[in-house]
Each structure stands twice: as C-alpha cells, then as structure tokens.
Amino acid sequence: MSRKNVLNLINTIVANSCKCPAHSHNYGSAAPTGVQTGQKEYAFEMSASTVRFGPGVSVEVGADLRNLGAKKVCLVTDRNVAKLPSVKVALDSLARHGINYEVYDETRVEPTDASLWHAADYARQNEFDAFLAIGGGSVMDTAKAANLFSSDREAEFLDYVNCPIGKGKEISVKLKPLIAMPTTSGTGSETTGVAIFDYKRLHAKTGISSKYLKPTLAIIDPLHTLSQPERVMAFAGFDVFCHALESFTAVDYRERGPAPSDPSLRPTYQGRNPISDVWARFALETIRKNFINAIYEPGNLEARSQMHLASTMAGVGFGNAGVHLCHGLSYPISGNVRNYKPAGYTADHALIPHGLSVVISAPAVFEFTAPACPDRHLEAAKLLGAKVDGVRASDAGRLLADTVRGFMQRAGIENGLRELGFSSSDVPNLVDGTLPQERITKLAPRAQTQENLAQLFENSMVAY
C-alpha cells in the first residue's frame, strides 16, 4: 500500500470512528460532541492491578485461581517460556489445588493482529473462566486480547483497537479474571490496561487500551528473572527505562485537554501527576543502581529482583500518566523491520525487540522535549546518576541525552537506526507510521510537526 493510500485510509477511519477524549485526534475532520465540558482538566485518577511481589511467590497462583472460583483456566505462554521452571512451578500449583487448565503456547514474540486473533479464536472455542499469563509482554498482551474477545464473542477485531486504525470501542462486557506472571523485566504489562501489536496492513504498531484490560492480579516473582538471557534483560530493561523517563516528562495532567463530561471517559493515559511521579522516581533510582549489573550478572538475584520491581513500578506509573515520543516513534520502527534479528532471541522472523525500538530514539527525543520542562529533565538525569550542579536549564536536554547514551553504550545497544537496517530514505515512511500514534505523542511536553518528527528520526540514525 502506498504512503498516500495509507494516509487516506487513516483519515477515513478517523472521520468515522470514536469521538471521545480518550481517543480524540487533531487530524480528524469532525469535532467530538457531547463528551467534553470545555472546562480545563482538573483531576487525575490512579488505577492499577493488585500486585504481589516476592521470591517464590508463584507457588500461590493455584490458590489464587481457586479463590477466584476458576474451574477451567487458559494458561497463555510461548514455546520458549513453556520449557522454563516458572511454568512448571505454576502447573504444579494448579494441580495441587485441583484447577483444570489448557495451555496455549503459540504466542508470537512481538504480536501481530493475526497472532492475537489466533489466540482469541482458541479462547472462543473453549469455555475458560479465567486466564493465567506466564511470560513477557507479548504473552501478557496476548492473554488480554484472548480474554477480551472470548468475553465478547460478537466483536470484530478492530472494534476495540485504538483510533484511528480501529474503532476504539469502549469495553462494556465483563471480562474474566486474569492473573499475570511476568518472566521478563520490561513491559510492565502486568499492571496496565494496554495490549500492543503490529498491524501488518499498515506496517505500524497500535493497540487496545482500557482500564478494564488490567490483570486482576500481578504475581511478581524475581526467581523467574534468573532465566532471562543477557540481551533480553538489556532490551527489556530499556523499556522500563523509557517508561519511567517518558511518564516523568509527560505533559502535566492539567494540560492534557478538557475534562470529560463523565468520569468514565477520562483516558487511560492522563499525563504526569503527583502519584505517577512517585513510581517513576523509584524506577529511575532503581535503574541507576541495578540495571547494568542485572544485564551482565545473570545470577545476581538482588539486581534482577530490583529491576523486576522497577518494571512493575514504572508500569503503574506510565499506566496512568502515559508515555510519549520514544514509544510513538518506536512503533513504525518495529513495524518496518526488514532483516534485523537480535542476538539472544530464538524467533523465526525478523524483529526489533520493543525495548530496543523505544530507546534507539531516546537521546534525540529528550534533547527535543527538554526546552518545555528543563527542570524535569535535569531531575531525571540526576536520578540516573548525572551531576547537575551548575548545569543551565538550556543544557538539560543535552545532559539527559548524554546520560541515556551512557547507559546504552554500557549495555551494548546498537548505535542508532542505521545498525537496525534503516536509512534516511526510510524517514518519510517512519513519519507516516508515527502519525496514527497521536494518542501518545500528544502527551509529550512539546508539540511536534511532521518536520520535527522527521528530524528526530534523522537524529536517531546514529545514537552515539
């Protein structure tokens, strides 16, 4: 599909899709009606899954499902994770408490619309009354989709997908209990109401977003992290890194837009707020102390435990405040991968791990956003270990960008988009793929033009 046809399709969808503040976009032709008060936003709300953390806590999952009244559970995982001790521990716990289950292990690393629909179809063919997700973000997001579409058997796939690609329908059906047990320290999906996937038709990432998608319970067991390969730890860790940085530097919730006429219409991503800041600060300090050790010392339970906790903490923070440009730019990067295959991954297809696609633009992004809130950027740099005494506000972006580059270099991250197979000729297509992500890019503290987006991609061709 040509770029022109893609943009025409997007504009057509926007003009005929949802008009609520949670999914509104500047480039639609029709204005929202009846859902905005015209009053400036004055409130934020905190919503998160119940979280249980502790080494070995996975043994409790059978009792949890029994207490939820589950009779037949869909255990969602992938074929690699299925071989790990974490799944055996869970299966033993289910058996010990008399819980019947079926295993779905066909999750795709970096899910697509087709892979999510495959899982949803599997769930629809069975009468599951609960879901258990054991794996990384791909597994947890797949479980969320399977839960949603098996609970609403009449729904078509695009009904719940975010505008402008989908219809952005609000979830009104009752979902089944979902317990999430992350085995990687990255996405924070165990606490968020977001499921992300590649929409192959447009070579772009999008997702389904609703507070009702949040898992019922997140079981955070640091023992699972000891099986993370080095590169998985590095790439997933940079997702935590950017979740914390982006939520901490997002637009203030009072500046996001007008207040909704009904509190149920307040968007999932609301902008930074005093509560989300607590989680982001904790995550950034924890990253400073533990990230590099967690990458290169796989047996260091303390470092890996702390990164596992930071992942959840950052997830709670960004799950309410939102993310912005690093994630917005990442979706067309991963959606337009050609031949890149990362070391340490066993996937049979080309892929750019999510954390890598996010951090690759981070130095350029934070140099761009810093003029809008330099104090925030200086504080973030300080939390990550930079010396900020005497640094001028005008240098805040450079300092934070250099701090990010330092972590990237120490972690052995690829040096920019060129090393992922991109060139300047790809920039127009990457910009086009970013435009549908306005749901999150509008949360950046500084507004962007298409020319700004193009320059961010150009500046990310070489990271350091």
Curated annotation (Swiss-Prot):
Top EC category: oxidoreductase
GO biological process: one example: glutamate catabolic process via 2-hydroxyglutarate
Pfam family, one: Fe-ADH
Entry GO terms, CC: mitochondrion
PANTHER family: ALCOHOL DEHYDROGENASE (PTHR11496), HYDROXYACID-OXOACID TRANSHYDROGENASE, MITOCHONDRIAL (PTHR11496:SF83)
Family statement drawn from the similarity comment of this UniProt entry: Belongs to the iron-containing alcohol dehydrogenase family. Hydroxyacid-oxoacid transhydrogenase subfamily.
Protein name: Probable hydroxyacid-oxoacid transhydrogenase, mitochondrial
Organism: Drosophila pseudoobscura pseudoobscura (Fruit fly)
